[in-house]
């Protein structure tokens, strides 16, 4: 039942992500996975560097990798603050066919949407988070 959805939430550690998704992909259950994207990968583990808010930074690509491996849709959640304690989320489909995209194209689209969200409401962005831990400023 829809009311049971809150009882079936699981947090999956990074190291267990692939194993858990593989296990759940073998069932007939419908699953939704959300990825926190506010951290910077370790500098020596960064597979991809891209431009984010005029800084050249390492970017996690796990969501794109998993989407391609398991052929899962990728959706961006745009969250807007309505008033204190009230938020509204809308969902923007990036792709329903991730295997048709070149490497990092989905990640780049996600970054574009995130930048747009931040530029529209910069006061709600946590500027102190670790996204810029390993950055290189772009020259103009």
PLM regions: where:
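Short, small-residue-biased leader/transition segments that mark boundaries at the very start
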Residues: 1-6
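Short acidic-hydrophobic, aromatic-tinged amphipathic segments that line or gate anion-handling sites
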Residues: 10-14
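Non-catalytic C-terminal accessory region of glycerolipid acyltransferases
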Residues: 15-140
